[in-house]
Amino acid sequence: MTTPSTRPTDDRAAGPASVPPPTALLLLRGPRERVAGWVSRSVVPLVVAPVGRWTVAVAAAGPPTGPPYDDGALLLVGRPVPARTGPALGFSETGGRAVITVHAAGRRRGPGWVVWEPGVGLVRPPGLDLAGPGEIVRLAGCPARTREELVDLLHETGPRPVTMLQAVMATLGLPGPRLLQDPVRAAELPGATRHDPSARQVSWFEDAVADSVRLRRELGVLE
C-alpha cells in the first residue's frame, strides 16, 4: 500500500540483472485523495508525486500478474480512470510503438487511444476508441492553436517512440517528459511515494480477469 511518510528507494543501485521498469506514466488531474484511492488499487508498482496541478504515476516495475496481463505499461495507461479521479493522460512505449491514452468525462467506452509507430506514423489498431488531437489539447489545458502543432508532430515518422512521447508532452506543456526515459528519477520528486500491490490485490485482479474471460466465452464473445 502507499505510505505517504516513506520516501521511495532509488532503484538505480540495483544489480545488472535487474529488469528495467516499463516505459509508462499517467498524469491525473483529480483531487489528490481520489487519485490516492485509484493508485491503491493498482497491480502495477508505481511511484506517485504531485507535479503542479497534476499527479504523476510512474511505472516503477513490471506487474506481478501473469500473461497476458504482464504488460505494465498498458496496465497503467489503459486502466479506466473514473470521472471524479480524472481527467488523465497516459504515455507509454509498448511493442515498439508510442501509445497515448485519454481519460475524460463523457467517454463511455474507456479511454481514447493514439498509437504511433516509427516509420509509419499514426496507426489505427482495430477495436480501440481513438482520441483526436483537439481532445488531447483541451484536456491538457493548451490554447486551441496547439492542435496544429500536435498534428504536425504526430505525422512525423522518424523519431523513436519514447522521443515522440517526450515531444508530445513538451508540446502540450506537460510535466515529467524526462521520466519516460529515466523513470527512477520519479523517486526524487518532492512528495514522492511508492505503491506496491499486495498479494491479495493481485489475486483479486487475476480472479476478476478469469471471471470476465469465462463470461465472455459463455456469451460467445470469445472463441
Report each predicted region and the residues it spans.
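Hydrophobic alpha-helical segments that drive targeting, anchoring, or assembly
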Residues: 12-161
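N-terminal acidic, proline/glycine-rich, low-complexity intrinsically disordered segments
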Residues: 1-9
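Long, compositionally biased intrinsically disordered terminal regions
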Residues: 108-109, 117-223
